[in-house]
Amino acid sequence: MVSYKDLGLVNTREMFAKAVKGGYAIPAFNFNNMEQLQAIIQASAEEKSPVILQVSKGARNYANQTLLRYMAEGAVQYAKELGWEHPQIVLHLDHGDSFELCKSCVDMGFSSVMIDGSALPYEENIALTKKVVEYAHKYDVTVEDELGVLAGVEDEVAAEESHYTKPEEVIDFATRTGCDSLAISIGTSHGAYKFKPEQCTRDPKTGRLVPPPLAFDVLHEIEKKLPGFPIVLHGSSSVPQEYVDIINQYGGKLPDAVGIPEEQLREAAKSAVCKINIDSDSRLAMTAAVRKVFAEKPSEFDPRKYLGPARDEMKKLYEHKIVDVLGSNGKAE
């Protein structure tokens, strides 16, 4: 048993309470490798922003659970090295699909876990979540759950259609499960193709897809039912078109990739939404930078020469999200 407290990590309880009260959101950045982790810590330390390091089941398998533990501990020490005296860093399991996986993560030093029973019948989702909560809370690990289903494909999470969260269910669900935060569905979705062309309009000047607005009416109803309760948005990458253009320019094929407009995320961050998940954007930043290096320097084969620029581009992206979108800068001095 490894306690996250021994690794220098924190859980989400206090940071979420501050975020809801302060009208900003905590960035939850998914990572798979060292360069992504370095970029996240560099940006967070520079901006003094609390941050959630998210690891999916697939990323955990890719990076290895033992290495992840030491990467997280190293991230805390690296943040201090960069001058962040009191780093507020969470290690979070994203989309845990079983009690066994959540338990394993708690036992290996995660400070927060998500149990995703959203595809289960309502009562089964409650029972599974409650079981995870009871185990995690014994070790002061916080638990996120999802009510409603997001469409799209990202990592090992896939669904054909989204189903909005039903506001009338949230009080019963949160009360009976004891979860610490609730991921809801209001129109976000996973992956770089968050909307089908038929769901969008098309800008006549640029030819780009314009996505439909999020269902803020559903969010506001949920806020009324659960005032002050921490709400989470998944699938909230904006799919920056400059990265899509670079990828396509240098041999990629991402036609009509479209994400969540940042002005809608800014609006969400001012509400009870205190955690916003971002994964695809960093993948796009990394891929765009690597493709550009390979195209401009076809003889290059030193990984540092293409992963270094990728890391730098991701850092710029993370800083932009922290400062210009979520408003979490300066909240973890």
Q: Can you describe what each PLM-predicted range is?
A:
Residues 1-27, 300-301:
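Generic N-terminal amphipathic, Lys/Arg-enriched alpha-helix
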Residues 3, 24-32, 59, 305, ...:
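A short N-terminal beta->alpha junction/helix N-cap motif
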Residues 10-21, 34-59, 65-86, 95-230, ...:
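Alpha/beta enzyme core
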Residues 26-30, 91-92, 114, 231-233, ...:
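Short catalytic-loop micro-motif centered on adjacent basic/acidic residues
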Residues 53, 60-64, 265, 274-298, ...:
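Shared catalytic-loop signature of beta/alpha-barrel
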Residues 235-238, 258, 278-282:
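Short acidic/histidine-rich active-site segments
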Residues 258-259, 273:
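A C-terminal functional module that forms or caps the active site or interfaces directly
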Residues 289-333:
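Extended, intrinsically disordered, low-complexity segments
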